[in-house]
Amino acid sequence: MAKLYVYDSYENRMLVYNNLNENDPMPYSYGSTLSVREFRGSSNARVLWTTTRAMEAWNLTRRRYGAGIPVGYAFKRIWEGGHGTASQHYAGVAFDVGQGTSRAIRQRIHAAATATRAWGYVEPLSMTPTWVHFDRRYGTPACSGTTSGYPTCRRGDKNTYVLILQDALNALGYTTGTLDGVFGARTETALKGVQRRFGLT
């Protein structure tokens, strides 16, 4: 059973789905084109998250492609690793698909994802020789000169990037009291504790 947070940027709210079965369709996904198990991929976490916009981008891609898209990896928690330090997989908005398919099929999936214009980034096929990567990153990266970083999280923010922050703080032993995607007082206290520990204040 999984607990799923879905950030709705249109309403700036976090929706919560408790006790989802692995074969249940992902909330906001088109029909039964993406199951919780497929979205989870190799993650062993019980708590997962994504955004309505990522699901909308998935739906547009799936409709344009017109057939099933095998999902190898989507969600990962930051402490599970397997991706770069600012991976959009940790935000629940990235998909690595098409593993085990032919080059021609991957080219069709890539073309469909690109044509939707719904993804923030569709990785060039030259960088992903045996899969297709696309993600629906959002916000402005905190570091200038890049499009791949995470946005700044501030007190009062509510989104999946706050969930990453809370997850990382909890993994380091600085408890945020909860994992809810809301940057409140306990998250701020935990963050300041880490900043002091590493001399970042």
Predicted regions and their residues:
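Active-site acidic/histidine clusters and adjacent loop/turn architecture
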Residues: 1-68
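Surface-exposed loop/edge segments in extracytoplasmic proteins
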Residues: 174-176
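Surface-exposed patches in mature extracellular/periplasmic domains of secreted proteins
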Residues: 67-75, 119-126, 178-179
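Amphipathic alpha-helical segments that form well-ordered structural scaffolds
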Residues: 56-60, 164-168, 190
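Catalytic cores and adjacent binding grooves of peptidoglycan-active enzymes
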Residues: 4-8, 85-95, 99-172, 181, ...
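Extracellular LysM carbohydrate-binding repeats and other cell-envelope/extracellular binding modules
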Residues: 187-201
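Active-site-adjacent loop/helix surface patches within enzyme catalytic domains
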Residues: 56-90
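Short, surface-exposed alpha-helical recognition segments that flank or form part
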Residues: 45-49, 157, 178
